[in-house]
Swiss-Prot record:
GO terms for biological process: tRNA modification. It comes from Sinorhizobium fredii (strain NBRC 101917 / NGR234). HAMAP family: TrhO. Residues 135-229 form the Rhodanese domain. It comes from the Bacteria. Its EC number is 1.14.-.-. One of its GO terms (molecular function) is oxidoreductase activity, acting on paired donors, with incorporation or reduction of molecular oxygen. This is tRNA uridine(34) hydroxylase.
Length: 314
């Protein structure tokens, strides 16, 4: 049976508050915390994904202001999360279909067991000071995100490792000895969490001056006016908004639901684009079986839309 979710029209919903959060901390009781946290989120109409592990918490949630406030108050009331910080943005419609609290080995998967961001990380740089750092010719700027994210936006002059997953980043560093040619390393990611591990890893590898953007791209776009910005493009986000721009306004990108790659308006006009079936990035690798399966899913989504529902596979 196909799962459906009845959802009010976006114009009836108003704006939703989106909270992105993470916190590295020793958290041995993470498994037993899953049920109570799920219950608090469900009771307050909050949706999204939160990851729990021995090393802390990570995720993004959305809901009404009151709902988000209640969940955040519950989290910060826990002794492990008293220092929890979060970043806020807005969405015209609920950007998540359901609430998931998941147990993981790591809250962001790098696969290097010898580093601990609770012990060693790089130096935080506030958004207002970031431009001066990355404009310094003595600084090498590195984007720690994956290739589908960097494809739609980068800081000017940044090195793009073009990794498929964050697990590939350590090998990329080990294989690029030229990274030692400049005395300063400046690193950034979407919200800051990947840089916690990336800078810890760089320090372990012998890099001394390692910096990272506090609050990530999201905090920079929130605080730095477009006319002063060194950011080019949009920032990929892991919800139905797909991308955000300066002021955290929703971007113009959509998502290919076949390969999960972000699409520009120009990509959508390509003859290779068939909604939910293929796009400029994946059309060459789709079999006819794949296409027919995706077309059936699109038919189910269209039927759900006619009934005023949202298909959970959309």
């Amino acid at each position: 049976m196909t799962d459906m979710l009845t959802t009010p029209r976006p114009e009836a919903q108003g704006q939703f508050l989106v909270a992105a959060l993470y916190h590295f901390v020793a958290f041995p009781r993470f498994a037993e915390f899953r049920g109570p946290l799920q219950a608090v989120c469900d009771a307050n109409g909050v949706k999204g994904t939160l990851l729990l592990a021995h090393e802390g918490i990570n995720g993004t949630i959305a809901g009404t202001e009151a709902g988000i406030a209640t969940v955040l108050a519950y989290l910060t009331a826990q002794p492990e999360f008293t220092g929890l910080e979060h970043k806020e943005s807005r969405a015209a419609a609920m950007p998540f279909l359901r609430m998931k609290v998941r147990l993981k080995k790591e809250i962001v998967t790098m696969g290097v067991e010898t580093i601990d961001p609770n012990q060693v990380v790089g130096t935080y740089v506030e958004p207002k000071d970031w431009n001066a750092l990355i404009a310094d010719p003595e600084t090498l700027v590195i984007d720690t995100r994956n290739d589908y994210e960097t494809a739609i936006g980068l800081f000017r002059g940044a090195v793009d490792p073009q990794t498929k997953t964050f697990r590939e980043f350590p090998d990329w560093v080990r294989n690029h000895t030229g990274l030692h040619n400049k005395p300063k390393i400046a690193m950034y990611c979407t919200g800051g969490i990947r840089c916690e591990k990336a800078t810890a890893f760089m320090k372990e590898q012998g890099f001394e001056e390692v910096y990272h953007l506090k609050g990530g791209i999201l905090k920079y776009l929130e605080q730095i006016p477009a006319e002063e910005s060194l950011w080019d493009g949009a920032c990929f986000v892991f919800d139905e908004r797909v991308s955000v721009t300066h002021g955290l306004a929703e971007g113009e990108h959509t998502l290919c639901h076949a390969c999960r790659q972000p699409l520009t308006p120009e990509d959508v006009l390509s003859p290779h684009h068939e909604e939910g079936v293929s796009c400029v990035h994946c059309h060459a690798v789709r079999t006819e079986e794949d296409r027919e399966r995706y077309r059936e899913r699109q038919r189910q989504i269209a039927l759900a839309k006619k009934r005023g529902e949202r298909h959970l596979g959309s």
